[in-house]
Structure formats: C-alpha cells, structure tokens
Regions:
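Catalytic core of pol beta-like nucleotidyltransferases
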Residues: 1-22, 30-36, 47-97
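Short, conserved active-site loops that position catalytic residues or coordinate cofactors/metal ions
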Residues: 38-40
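Short hydrophobic/aromatic beta-strand micro-patches
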Residues: 43-45
C-alpha cells in the first residue's frame, strides 16, 4: 500500500511529465483513512497545455508507479453541484506541479 507521501510525490512527477497545472487528491487518501484495499482518487486540472487524451496515460502511469488502482478524472469531466464535485471541494488536497 503506497503512503500518502509517495502518492503525492508521484502525482507531482506526472503533472510535470504531462504538463498539467495541478491536481486534487480526494477520497480515502485525502481523508487519511486509506486501507490496503483503497484506490487513489485524483482530479487533474490540465490547463492550456494538457491534451485531454493524456488523462488516460496519466492514470495508467499512476497505477503502474504505485502498483494500485486509481481513478483519475480531468476537471472538465466533473459537473459542478454533483456529489463528486462537492466531495472534491470539501476534502480535496491540492497538489501543485
């Protein structure tokens, strides 16, 4: 099970690799109640230089680097006012490139 520090470090590296602006870590890793069965939940803020198709490679690289499941979204995929969006704004931990 990766530590939160390892998760944040890997996300930072991937943000730089894919030229994305920043990300939000949310879910159990953000709350600090992750278990060996937990996946990693991330929303990427791609920005102007991030190709929308890079989200798939970003997700796969995150899964491979940390040897665990990960759910990765680009912020444009998340509708405001939904439970997912509300969860992001409430518990999300911002990770800067």
């Amino acid at each position: 099970m990766p530590t939160r520090l390892a998760v944040e470090k890997t996300i930072k590296e991937l943000l730089a690799r894919y030229n994305a602006e920043d990300a939000l870590l949310f879910g159990s890793y953000a709350r600090g109640d992750e278990t060996p069965e937990s996946d990693i939940d991330v929303v990427v803020f791609g920005g102007d230089h991030f190709k929308k198709t890079d989200i798939f490679a970003f997700a796969e690289d995150l899964r491979e680097a940390l040897a665990t499941n990960a759910d990765v979204f680009e912020i444009s995929e998340v509708d405001k006012g939904t439970p997912l969006y509300d969860s992001l704004m409430k518990e999300g931990i911002k990770i800067f490139r």
